[in-house]
């Protein structure tokens, strides 16, 4: 997986619901050249949310999906000041999203990346850094996490 760059991070994502946030994440993935079709990837993310919320807890969601439109594994990060209902496991609204996309054949990559993120998301300091950090801080935090 390629390292995240500043163009993979949106600290002021717009939208008041799952559809609008996921649509913007799919657009960011397309703009970064990670996918070939933003609509197809959006449908993948929406289907995953319909099966079970990706709201991990503590204000963080990890929307993810495998799709033929994904060219290489990638991670994006988005945040907004106002949290929105994401039907998270702890009932808290979400204001941070770590979005993961992998090619259709990327089951192993997906499991590895989600496992790495989940081991970090349980720590309050990690969440605090995601919620408060500037672009450079979030970039360094996620790149360090994903390379370990």
Swiss-Prot record:
GO biological process, one term: fructose import across plasma membrane
CDD domains linked to this entry: PTS_IIA_fru
Transferase found in the keyword field: yes
Residue span(s) of domain PTS EIIA type-2: 2-145
Entry annotated with the keyword Metal-binding: no
Keywords noted in UniProt: Cytoplasm, Kinase, Phosphoprotein, Phosphotransferase system, Sugar transport, Transferase, Transport
GO CC terms: cytoplasm; transmembrane transporter complex
Localization terms from the record: Cytoplasm
Pfam families assigned: PTS_EIIA_2 (PF00359)
SUPFAM superfamilies in the cross-refs: Phoshotransferase/anion transport protein
Single annotated GO MF: kinase activity
Catalytic residue positions: 64 (tele-phosphohistidine intermediate)
Modified residues annotated as Phosphohistidine in this record: 64
NCBIfam families assigned: fruA, PRK09913.1
Domain text: The PTS EIIA type-2 domain is phosphorylated by phospho-HPr on a histidyl residue. Then, it transfers the phosphoryl group to the PTS EIIB type-2 domain.
Task of the protein: The phosphoenolpyruvate-dependent sugar phosphotransferase system (sugar PTS), a major carbohydrate active transport system, catalyzes the phosphorylation of incoming sugar substrates concomitantly with their translocation across the cell membrane. The enzyme II FrvAB PTS system is involved in fructose transport.
Protein name: PTS system fructose-like EIIA component
Organism: Escherichia coli (strain K12)
């Amino acid at each position: 997986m390629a390292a995240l760059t500043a163009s993979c991070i949106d600290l002021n994502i717009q939208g008041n619901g799952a559809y609008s946030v996921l649509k913007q994440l799919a657009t960011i993935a397309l703009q970064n050249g990670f996918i070939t079709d933003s609509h197809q990837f959006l449908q993948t993310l929406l289907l995953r949310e319909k099966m079970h919320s990706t709201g991990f807890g503590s204000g963080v969601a990890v929307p993810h999906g495998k799709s033929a439109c994904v060219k290489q594994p990638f991670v994006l990060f988005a945040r907004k000041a106002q949290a929105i209902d994401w039907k998270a496991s702890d009932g808290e609204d979400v204001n941070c999203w770590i979005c993961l996309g992998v090619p259709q054949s990327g089951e192993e990559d997906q499991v590895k990346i989600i496992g790495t993120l989940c081991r970090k998301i349980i720590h309050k300091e990690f969440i605090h850094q995601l919620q408060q950090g500037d672009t450079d801080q979030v970039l360094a935090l996620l790149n360090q996490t994903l390379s370990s």
